[in-house]
Amino acid sequence: MYNLKKGLDIPISGSPDGSISDSTKISHVGVLGPDYVGMKPTMMVESGDKVNIGSKLFEDKKNPGIFYTSPATGTIKSINRGDKRRFISIEIEVSDEESQVEIYNDSNEAIIDNISKFGVINNFRTRPFNKTPKPNDIPEDIFINLCDTNPLSVDPYIYLHHEIDLFNKSLLKLKEIYKCNIHVCYQN
C-alpha cells in the first residue's frame, strides 16, 4: 500500500452531501468529442433522429466495431463540428418517456459482442497508453477503479450501494467470460 505524503491541496470549502436527488428534470444531454481523445467518428444519426438509451450514435473510424451510444432517450437536436469538421458534440433533447435498447441473450459470446455493440467497451482502457481496447482483445487482468480523488468529487459507492449485488454479479460474469483476475480499487 502506498501513502502519498504530498499532493495538490486546493482550498475549497464544502463537499458533496452524498445524496442523489430527483428534483431536477434534465432537458438536454450532450456527448462531447473531447472526452474521446484520438477518436474519429462515423456518424450514424442526423439532426432530428429519435434515439433510445443505448442507440448507436457513431462508430470510431480508427477502430471499426467500437460504437458510442446514446445516454438518454430523445431527439438529436444538433451535431456540432469545429475546424476541419472536428467532432465537438451531439446534443440530445431528452423526452419524457424513457426507453432503452433491449438485450435478451446472456451467453458469453453474446455478452462479449454486446460490450462493444452497445458502447460499454468505451469505459474500458488498455495500459499503458489509455486507449479503448479492440472488441476481440482478451485482457490478462481487469482493474476497476472506484477511487476519485479529484476535489469535490463524489464517492462512487453512493451510486453503487443500491445495486451492489448486481455489481458483484457483473464482476463474477466478467471473470467467467474473460478468465482473468478482477481487481477492484476503492477507498476505505
Language-model regions, residue ranges each:
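N-terminal, Lys/Arg-enriched amphipathic/low-complexity engagement segments
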Residues: 1-44, 59, 91-93
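A generic structural signal for short beta-strands and their flanking turns/coil linkers
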Residues: 27, 70-72, 88
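Short, conserved secondary-structure segments in the cores of folded domains
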Residues: 41, 47, 64-67
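Short, well-structured beta-strand-loop connectors
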Residues: 45-59, 78
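Short alpha-helical basic/polar micro-motif
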Residues: 49-52, 72, 165-169
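Short, charged beta-turn/beta-strand-edge "cap" motif at the junction between a beta-strand
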Residues: 56-65, 83
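Short, compositionally biased
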Residues: 65-81
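Buried, small/hydrophobic-residue-enriched core segments of structured protein domains
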Residues: 80-188
